[in-house]
């Protein structure tokens, strides 16, 4: 019967498929949002309070989507001492398009050349900020399919989020996240628990192939985001209730059943409103809400219709106040990267996940269910969940993934603050040069973090060449931004059961390596 699974299907799947490791990269400089308010001549607090943003990361003409992804992939491989031959699938989610034919993934294959591993499935996936999640789902589906050969899948989500001068510019940011997907993971995907909503909308789109800037309908974009959240949460609740009923539990799912709830974050204030929105959904879905003390003071809103409340300030204010404690418990910590670095488009929601893992101990995380809402304009959205393993012992997979992110706040703090006029000059430089051929970037590489890949030149045929900023000292990534040689014989994360011969380990590539995507 269509839609049914055989009784023994569970035995066919690899155990505990999920996120084995996570690496995040953001540029080495940022602009302070309070200073940007002054520079833009707007009221104090418009960006810092109204949007909830403190700092915004940005990159110079030395970085593009290829270099961002090269950096985050190599850092993940080095930090965990993984061999490049243990990757069997590599997919990139991005909306930062610099070539309408050649994928970012194909550029990343340069990192795999020394290993000799070219047997790697996957390409790029694009739909605004949703591409990273689509790539994650494809990776999970591959590991759970007959195509799986026993190796890891690697997902890269990355973007450069920049806007023309005006109200939208302070909602920008830059970043990339790499996710290692495989079995026996500390963060396990809840099978069968995805609530998805797809719809045609012109809320945010990029029709001008010569511009990095989007066309944005701000009001429609907020409505689309919140309505998609309503739809996805409704579907998710129905699916988990059906699962619970099969297990003999007769109860409705609410926000309290999530240990953490993270969101795609265009700006932090929208996330706080979104958590309140889910609380409103719980309120309207509760047949006994008049008897539930958590809804005390909200009785006047019992007859509202969701579709009439997107811009109802009374509803918004009341439910943000009523859900403030839930927000502090389940969501606030996830906004570290968003608040300090800004919107990273496809990698935004996974930056939120990194923020949670960086600020809680394995013992605090163990056994929790993490709700994840991913949204991409146009539109595509899914609410799904991860279940954190119960094993929080020293040396466990959960202990390793949290330890690998313990330097996140110090990395954010180590960046350089740049004056708003310098930020504006960099934006103008990108605007004038990002599409040029026969171009040598003008900005210095000295401001880049050590180990960052950067653009060396674009030749007359638009072929791009990259190099990696060398390390001044050979010290571990666990101690800061130093080098751990890739392709070492001993992996910190055990590879899945190999179904293919393992290629010999190769030496780490030279710090002065230069790679290109074309012959010169």
Swiss-Prot record:
InterPro entries: HMG_CoA_synt_AS, HMG_CoA_synt_C_dom, HMG_CoA_synth_N, HMG_CoA_synthase_euk, Thiolase-like. It catalyses: acetoacetyl-CoA + acetyl-CoA + H2O = (3S)-3-hydroxy-3-methylglutaryl-CoA + CoA + H(+). Pathway: Metabolic intermediate biosynthesis; (R)-mevalonate biosynthesis; (R)-mevalonate from acetyl-CoA: step 2/3. Keywords: Acetylation, Cholesterol biosynthesis, Cholesterol metabolism, Cytoplasm, Lipid biosynthesis, Lipid metabolism, Phosphoprotein, Steroid biosynthesis, Steroid metabolism, Sterol biosynthesis, Sterol metabolism, Transferase. It is found in: Cytoplasm. One of its GO terms (cellular component) is cytoplasm. The active site is at 95 (proton donor/acceptor), 129 (acyl-thioester intermediate), 264 (proton donor/acceptor). The keyword Lipid biosynthesis applies. Its EC number is 2.3.3.10. One of its GO terms (biological process) is cholesterol biosynthetic process. The keyword Cell membrane does not apply. Residues 488-520 are annotated as: Disordered. CoA binds at residues 44-46, 167, 221, 269, 273. It holds the Pfam family HMG_CoA_synt_N. The modification Phosphoserine is found at residues 4, 495, 516. (3S)-3-hydroxy-3-methylglutaryl-CoA binds at residues 43-44, 129, 167, 171, 221, 264, 273, 343, 377. One of its GO terms (molecular function) is hydroxymethylglutaryl-CoA synthase activity. Its main location: cytoplasm. It is an enzyme of class 2 (transferase). Residues 507-520 have a biased composition (Polar residues). The modification N6-acetyllysine is found at residues 46, 273. Catalyzes the condensation of acetyl-CoA with acetoacetyl-CoA to form HMG-CoA, which is converted by HMG-CoA reductase (HMGCR) into mevalonate, a precursor for cholesterol synthesis. Belongs to the thiolase-like superfamily. HMG-CoA synthase family. Homodimer. This is Hydroxymethylglutaryl-CoA synthase, cytoplasmic. It comes from Mus musculus. The lineage of its organism: Eukaryota, Metazoa, Chordata, Craniata, Vertebrata.
């Amino acid at each position: 019967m269509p839609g049914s699974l055989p009784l023994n299907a569970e035995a066919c799947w690899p155990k505990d498929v999920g996120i084995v490791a996570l690496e995040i990269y953001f540029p080495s400089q940022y602009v302070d949002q309070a200073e940007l308010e002054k520079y833009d001549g707007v009221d104090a607090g418009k960006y810092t309070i109204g949007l909830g943003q403190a700092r915004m990361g940005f990159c110079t003409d030395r970085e593009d989507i290829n270099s961002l992804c090269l950096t985050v992939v190599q850092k993940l491989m080095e930090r965990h001492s993984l061999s490049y031959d243990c990757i069997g699938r590599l997919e990139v989610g991005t909306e930062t398009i610099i070539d309408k034919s050649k994928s970012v993934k194909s550029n990343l294959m340069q990192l795999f050349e020394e290993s000799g591993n070219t047997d790697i499935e996957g390409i790029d996936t694009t739909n605004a900020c949703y591409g990273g999640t689509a790539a994650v789902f494809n990776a999970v589906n591959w590991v759970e399919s007959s195509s799986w050969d026993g190796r890891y899948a690697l997902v890269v989500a990355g973007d450069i989020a920049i806007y023309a001068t005006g109200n939208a510019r302070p909602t920008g940011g830059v970043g990339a996240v790499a996710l290692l997907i495989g079995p026996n993971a500390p963060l396990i995907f809840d099978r069968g628990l995805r609530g998805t909503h797809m719809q045609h909308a012109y809320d945010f789109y990029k029709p001008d192939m010569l511009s990095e800037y989007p066309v944005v309908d701000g009001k429609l974009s907020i409505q689309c985001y919140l309505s998609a959240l309503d739809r996805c949460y409704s579907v998710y609740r129905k699916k988990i209730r059906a699962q619970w009923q099969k297990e003999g539990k007769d109860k409705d799912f609410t926000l309290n059943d999530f240990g953490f709830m993270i969101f795609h974050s265009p700006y932090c204030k929208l996330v706080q409103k979104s958590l309140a929105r889910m609380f409103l959904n719980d309120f309207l879905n509760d047949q006994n809400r008049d008897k539930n003390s958590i809804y005390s003071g909200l009785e006047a809103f019992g007859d509202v219709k969701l579709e009439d409340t997107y811009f109802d300030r009374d509803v918004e204010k009341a439910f943000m106040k009523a859900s403030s404690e839930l927000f502090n418990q389940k969501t606030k910590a996830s906004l570290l990267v968003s608040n300090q670095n800004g919107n990273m488009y496809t990698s935004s929601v996974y930056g939120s996940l990194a923020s949670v893992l960086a600020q809680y101990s394995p013992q605090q995380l163990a056994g929790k269910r993490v709700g994840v809402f991913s949204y991409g304009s146009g539109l595509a959205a899914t609410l799904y969940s991860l279940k954190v393993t119960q094993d929080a012992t020293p040396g466990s997979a959960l202990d390793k993934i949290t330890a690998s992110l313990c330097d996140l706040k110090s990395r954010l703090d180590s960046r350089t603050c740049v004056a708003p006029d310098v930020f504006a000059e960099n934006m103008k430089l990108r605007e004038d040069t990002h599409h040029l051929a026969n171009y040598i970037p003008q900005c210095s590489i000295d401001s880049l973090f050590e180990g960052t890949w950067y653009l060396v030149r674009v030749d007359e045929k638009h072929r791009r060449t990259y190099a990696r900023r060398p390390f001044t000292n050979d010290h571990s990534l666990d101690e800061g931004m130093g080098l751990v040689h890739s392709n070492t014989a001993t992996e910190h994360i055990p590879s899945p059961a190999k179904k293919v011969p393992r290629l010999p380990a190769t030496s780490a590539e030279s710090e002065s390596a230069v790679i290109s995507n074309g012959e010169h």
